[in-house]
């Protein structure tokens, strides 16, 4: 490449690359700065409200709180959010996926018994008796914000906390369903939640300073 062409290429890269960084990515995104965003969420158990720019899911009784979005056609997905266990929490918080009812779903949770736990509830019957399947040790703290990420593809799920791989699990009993958040005897604060995947509608997400996820990452990481 001669010098003139090299300079031209460098100028093009300098002009285009910043535009790529600042253009919107596409995902279903909630920053919870607008109280109207609460109307998208279906609360199956517990209480869900938007307070000070965060979605608060609360059920401190000895039972679960679940809030979901989506429909029964959703399959594979990437879910990200910032999540905090608030004061008064006694047990766990996390994600649910492929949910058809409040007794039919998969769940991954960050637990106050110092572990990350995966399980599933199939028509009211808990897998593994409700105990976490192959739990991973984790030093869970109240009032500490964590960045959670769940990647679901086919029968496979993989979970990250603050970018650290916390394990992989497989199960073939549930193929589709809604996604959401869940607590058990806890209060969970959620911010900057985004989700994408095949068939999931999109809203513009600014890729600067946001958790913009791309469906292509699933294929790229394989």
Descriptions of predicted regions:
Residues 160-182:
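Short, solvent-exposed beta-strand-to-loop segments that form ligand-recognition rims
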Residues 34-66:
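Extracellular glycan-recognition surfaces and repeat-rich motifs
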Residues 32, 79-81, 141-161:
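Short tryptophan-centered beta-strand motifs in secreted/extracellular beta-sheet-rich domains
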Residues 32, 191-195:
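Extracellular beta-strand elements of beta-rich domains used
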Residues 10-22:
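Bacterial N-terminal signal peptides
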Residues 124-149:
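Short, aromatic/His-centered strand-loop micro-motif at the edge of beta-sheets
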Residues 59-126:
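Secretory/extracellular carbohydrate-interaction modules
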Residues 24-45, 204-220:
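Extracellular carbohydrate-recognition regions
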